[in-house]
Amino acid sequence: MRAKVELAVLLLVLVGVAAGTRPPSAPPPVTEDTLQKVAGSLEMYVDELPQMPKIYGFSMRHGHPSPIRLTIGMYQKKWKFHRDLPASTVFVFGTSAATATFPGPTIEAAQGVPLSVTWQNYLPARHILPWDPTVPTAIPRRGGVPTVVHLHGGAHPPQSDGSAFAWFTAGFGETGPAWSTPTYTYPNAQSPGVLWYHDHALGLTRANLLAGLLGAYVIRNPAVEAPLGLPCGDEFDRVLMLADRSFYADGSIYMNYTGIIPNIHPQWQPEYFGEAITVNGKAWPFLAVARRRYRFRIINTSNARYFNLSLTNGLPFTVVGSDTNYLSKPVTAASLLVSVAETFDVVVDFSQSTSSEAELVNTAPYPYPDGQAPNDLNGKVMKFVISPAKAKDTSRVPAKLLDYVAVAEEEAVQRRYIVMYEYEDAATGNPTHLYINGKRLEDPATETPRPGTTEVWEVINLTPDNHPLHLHLATFQATRVRGLVDEDAFKGCMAKLNDAVRCNVSRHAVGEEVAVPEHEKGWKNVVKIAPGYMTTIVVKFFMVDSGKPYPFDATAEPGYVYHCHILDHEDNAMIRPLKLIK
């Protein structure tokens, strides 16, 4: 299967490029100063935070939720990111072109009620953003924009996972080698929480998400959640989808047309960072809030930017969940470091504010952790305008939330070593590509767990960047973060042997131990992997809320993947197959 997939990808690249299926022509060159001037011309906090349209993933029959089928399309249209910026051409999700939004509609599902979604592609023959045919990429023979949808954080069958090789163009005119069905099934059997859906096409994830193919997905269960007493209802329980973008003066979304090493990769660069920060599709919006508790489900949908979030009036975040799952008890945090694709579920009590306004600000360097500090533009996120009057508030933050299965590292049946590499061009020292365990996505799977088991993965980061590690299907938790000593010697050995055990990793992973933050000690689907450290994660291949097996065959084709969720890294080629076996 993998050999056929690899051959199919190669043929698509050769035939597609030969047939003229190329990235769009480059506009006149633009400088970073110009992009900053465009962003700087936009007055902050003049657009109200949008509430994205909601689509229910069930119908009520005799007082109970019942399964339904949805049809959601991907469309090209215009979107206003700011009052003073011309409308931008975007790719967006919706039930029609007229109702499609950036981000897409929030799908609200009921726990235990399956949902079927037919994803349809109505996108044009050519992409609105540049892409690079020299990285492994879905390139159809007859043009079109390949897409495929992944429900991030979902526990669902492999056929509904959105394999990078299961892409399709408009009208299913062409499909990838792993494509099997236009309709995906989401069991919604997992714990209530917030997920998000986004494009996952081979080599195009960074361009397709930058264009707007993303949206929120919330699983609810009133019987489980109502007793907690957390803020609820559309006004007081809000999804915040964060994304950085840069714009041309005409409103077009900027993406680089020239690569960091053009003679190797004409377009690819290791990270995309935008000057404007958007929340729910608006640049630096504001939200008027009452003096009471609010629940915010924060999702970082940026390509590469980390956010270190805090409120300028000193109010803390009370973290109640992360990455679709609740914590066992609330944790108070003055700031939140949110990696790419990571989510945090927090409560903010505005009744405790001594000011009438609070800015949500960002202090995370980019790239993280050793890049440049945020500036006056990308260091701001949004503003809360706080009512002077005291408001009625019946919500609370309980002392206890929800319990899931124990970490139980001793139950692990397998210990794996996962090593992150960055490869450099000898002439320039710039990165050319990134691999996990020195292998490509097209290479045979080496991570082959069995459903119902626990594994320990020792994730070793030999690159300069922090990487948000995402496993499809599985749920995991970091338990230890240990620094590497004599790292150069270890890197030298790994360059020769590519084997952590033979390179005596136990002798090197004895450095400083960094505590996992309390609000990250929960079951997650994204964990930050710090450079120069070995991070121990305990991985569960079953439902962590109940301890039960998956309610579907997780060993079916085309399997799953795990990858770095910095999209520019994932596309080139920091992604590997994850194949469960019987």
UniProtKB/Swiss-Prot annotation:
Residues 1-20 form the signal peptide. Binds 4 Cu cations per monomer. The Cu cations are bound as 3 distinct Cu centers known as type 1 or blue, type 2 or normal, and type 3 or coupled binuclear. Cu cation 3 binds at residues 200, 472, 563. Its cofactor is Cu cation. GO terms for molecular function: copper ion binding; oxidoreductase activity. It is an enzyme of class 1 (oxidoreductase). Its EC number is 1.-.-.-. Pfam families: Cu-oxidase, Cu-oxidase_2, Cu-oxidase_3. It is found in: Endoplasmic reticulum membrane. Induction: Induced by potassium deficiency. Belongs to the multicopper oxidase family. This is Multicopper oxidase LPR1 homolog 1. It comes from Oryza sativa subsp. japonica (Rice). The gene is LPR1.
